[in-house]
A protein has these predicted regions:
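Hydrophobic pocket/interface hotspot
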Residues: 20-21, 30, 55-57, 74, ...
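Beta-strand/loop substructures that line and gate deep hydrophobic ligand-binding cavities in soluble
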Residues: 82-127, 131-132
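Hydrophobic ligand-binding cavity/cleft-lining segments
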Residues: 1-40
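Glycine-rich portal/gate segments that line the openings of hydrophobic small-molecule binding cavities
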Residues: 41-85
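Charge-dense, helix-prone N-terminal extensions
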Residues: 3-4, 10-12, 58, 69, ...
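A short, structured loop/turn motif at beta-sheet edges
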Residues: 16-18, 49-50, 75-80, 96-105
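Generic C-terminal helix-cap and adjacent flexible tail
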Residues: 2, 134-138
């Protein structure tokens, strides 16, 4: 995947790669971790997890003030290694699953959007990844 400037977030998770992969790719699990702060949630998640398939995750403020469909298309899937995605706004993203001595290093790299500062985007995506880690390890 040819990527432009990237923002990178990662987490070291003390669980095996197959479990981390399952929790990241299975839409049932996504609703439990795909939010950056306690005042947001992911009330629905649908995913056709095959190359060329799409995912649609509804991201919503719990007070009902705002919601959006975070979606994309899976371009290339290497089971338990990597997932290449083109997001709905045509930005590219790659997710890497690396086995290590502690368990799994999960890395997400994505092209920034132009509306928000890159630091804000990195902080938000890292917060979601931190929620993911907490969900997987609880």
């Amino acid at each position: 995947m040819d990527l432009m400037k990237l923002i990178t977030v990662n987490a070291s998770i003390e669980k095996p790669v197959d479990m981390v992969w399952e929790y990241w790719t299975n839409a049932h699990h996504v609703t439990h971790w795909n939010f950056a702060s306690p005042d947001w949630h992911c009330p629905s998640a649908e995913s056709n997890f095959v190359e060329g398939g799409e995912f649609h995750y509804l991201m919503a403020a719990k007070d009902g003030s705002f919601e959006f469909d975070f979606w994309g298309t899976f371009q290339k899937i290497e089971p338990q290694k990597s997932i290449e995605i083109v997001l709905g706004d045509q930005r590219k993203m790659i997710v890497l699953f690396e086995k290590n001595a502690e368990g799994t290093k999960l890395t997400e790299q994505f092209e920034p959007e132009q509306e928000n500062a890159e630091e804000l985007q990195q902080a938000g995506w890292q917060a979601i990844l931190d929620q993911f880690k907490q969900y997987v390890t609880s």
